[in-house]
From Swiss-Prot:
Superkingdom of the organism of origin: Eukaryota
Domain UIM stretches: 99-118, 127-148
Effect of disrupting the coding gene: Reduced primary root growth, increased lateral root formation, and altered root system architecture, due to altered early phloem development.
Tissue and organ distribution: Expressed in the vasculature of leaves, inflorescence stems, flowers, hypocotyls, and primary and lateral roots. In roots, expressed in phloem companion cells.
Name recorded for this polypeptide: Protein DA1-related 2
Residue ranges of the region described as Disordered: 60-108, 447-474
UniProt PTM comment: Polyubiquitinated by DA2.
Pfam family, one: LIM
Length: 528
């Protein structure tokens, strides 16, 4: 994996959840006695009528004299919720028929009293009064009939308020979710606003979503192919993310020949084409805006950086040639160079101290079908007139990156011209990276709107690039690129470039650049 990329995994359960509809229910009807209660009442009534018929038969066969008997109708005692008769008269004063009649009244009264003990809130289902208890003809006292209670309204269905329209749901189907009820048409997706009619939906807190809407909101998409990033074998969403640009992409794009910008390291999106240089490198559109592609075009920037050194009292007395070269020419020069430390897979700059013949880019290429073509080169013999033969920089890089490379290589030249010998790579590369970082910082801070930003160096950055000022300042895109190049220097993982920069920058911030350089001259190390 690329050193500037990072891997991240997330479980779908943390960003994508599926919940089922709690229930879909038919309307609940309260306040009716079920069929079991009705059948029990009918059975009791049938048994009572059967007993009464037997009683009448026995009375007609063995009836008394028919003497008049005082009959006391049953009374209802409201406090006790029961029915009981008054004490009967002496048996000696009544005939057998009168006694039987009184027994019948007592039995019916007790049966009706039993019905009055039903739990409060129950009623009866009426069907043309077939089940309505009524007094019997043949002497049954109508005053003994006690009508049933009316249904209690407090046991009707519980009122449900719709969580969508805040009105009563009433009868009909309804949905329940997280303790809240909805009309079916009021249960809507929090993202698109349309009703959720599927059996499954997604929840984020208490907010419902269509599954697809929730996936669009939470499931990461690849910024290269613009598809949802797939899950791996463990069911986790695995993707790569650039540490500075936060560009998320599928892991497969690291080995499927997707183009990567040689300057900012961003991958080429499928809907935006990169430019291809003649040596095979790719350049994004933003980096292409300020790319420097030939030696003549780079001369103003080179002299501006020399002026920057002079402004810090580090003037380079020798005129060191500077050439923009192709990748192949730079690699060949590295092979012939005895001095120097190079850790990067692709070296983008070199400070020569040996005599060599180098092919430089004399005329910039022209644009054609997303390619730079028609570049003119020229071999050039470099002779050694001092400790430094020449400075070589890779062509086709944006202005700020080209300047950062020049500032780094010029520091190598300054060290050699000022008698710094046999420095270990961590010290030499580290202090050169500090000068590169300082120049980038001065370029980013040169805009008046950002002058209040803190500086990581104690050295004043009053010398700004006149080359940039002639162009009317830098765009926000170029400033963002400058921040990225600073980020690259500060977070380099190599011991010489990254570790050396952090040690050198700490010393320069604590003691100042001049005292740090004096200590390096005497001891070959950074001051602690």
């Amino acid at each position: 994996m690329d050193s500037s990329s990072s891997s991240s995994s997330s479980s779908p359960s943390s960003s994508y959840g599926v919940a089922r509809v709690s229930h879909i229910s038919n309307p609940c009807i309260f306040g009716e006695v079920g069929s079991s209660s009705s059948s029990t009442y009918r059975d009791k009534k049938w048994k009572l009528m059967k007993w009464v018929s037997k009683l009448f038969k026995s009375g007609s066969n063995g009836g008394g004299s028919g003497a008049h008997t005082n009959h006391h109708p049953p009374q209802f005692q409201e406090d006790e919720n029961m029915v009981f008769p008054l004490p009967p008269s002496s048996l000696d004063d009544r005939s057998r028929g009168a006694r039987d009649k009184e027994e019948l009244d007592r039995s019916i009264s007790l049966s009706l009293a039993d019905n009055t003990k039903r739990p409060h809130g129950y009623g009866w289902s009426m069907d043309n009064n077939r089940d309505f208890p009524r007094p019997f003809h043949g002497g049954l006292n109508p005053s003994s009939f006690i009508p049933p209670y009316e249904p209690s309204y407090q046991y009707r269905r519980r009122q449900r308020i719709c969580g969508g329209c805040n009105s009563d749901i009433g009868s009909g189907n309804y949905l329940g979710c997280m303790g809240t009820f909805f009309h079916p048409e009021c249960f809507r997706c929090h993202s698109c606003g349309y009703a959720i009619t599927e059996h499954e939906f997604s929840l984020s807190g208490t907010k419902p979503y269509h599954k697809l809407c929730f996936k669009e909101l939470t499931h990461p998409k690849c910024e290269v192919c613009h598809h949802f990033i797939p899950t791996n074998d463990a069911g986790l969403i695995e993707y790569r993310c650039h540490p500075f640009w936060n560009q998320k992409y599928c892991p497969s794009h690291e080995y499927d020949k997707t183009a990567r910008c040689c300057s900012c390291e961003r991958l080429e999106s499928w809907d935006v084409r990169y430019y291809t240089l003649e040596d095979g490198r790719s350049l994004c559109l933003e980096c292409m805006e300020t790319a420097i592609t030939d030696t003549g075009e780079c001369q103003p920037l080179y002299h501006a950086i020399r002026d920057y050194y002079e402004g810090m009292y580090m003037k380079l007395d020798q005129q060191i040639p500077m050439l923009l070269v192709q990748r192949e020419a730079l690699n060949d020069a590295i092979v012939g160079e005895k001095n120097g430390y190079h850790h990067m897979p692709e070296t983008r700059g070199l400070c020569l101290s040996e005599e060599q013949t180098v092919t430089s880019v004399l005329r910039r290429p022209r644009l054609g079908a997303h390619r730079l073509v028609g570049m003119r080169t020229q071999p050039q013999r470099l002779t050694r007139k001092c400790e430094v033969t020449a400075i070589l920089v890779l062509y086709g890089l944006p202005r700020l990156l080209t300047g950062a490379i020049l500032a780094h290589e010029l520091m190598h030249g300054w060290l050699r011209l000022n008698g710094f010998r046999n420095l270990n790579p961590e010290v030499e590369e580290g202090i050169c990276q500090v000068l590169s970082y300082m120049w980038l910082e001065s370029e980013v801070l040169s805009d008046p709107s950002t002058r209040n930003l803190p500086s990581t160096s104690s050295v004043a950055t009053s010398s700004s690039s006149s080359f940039s000022n002639k162009k009317g300042g830098k765009s926000n895109v170029e400033k963002k690129l400058g921040e990225f190049f600073k980020h690259q220097i500060a977070h380099d993982a190599s011991p010489a470039y990254g570790g050396g920069f952090r040690a050198a920058n700490a010393a320069a911030c604590k003691y100042g650049l001049r005292r740090t350089l004096d200590h390096i001259r005497l001891t070959g190390t950074f001051p602690l």
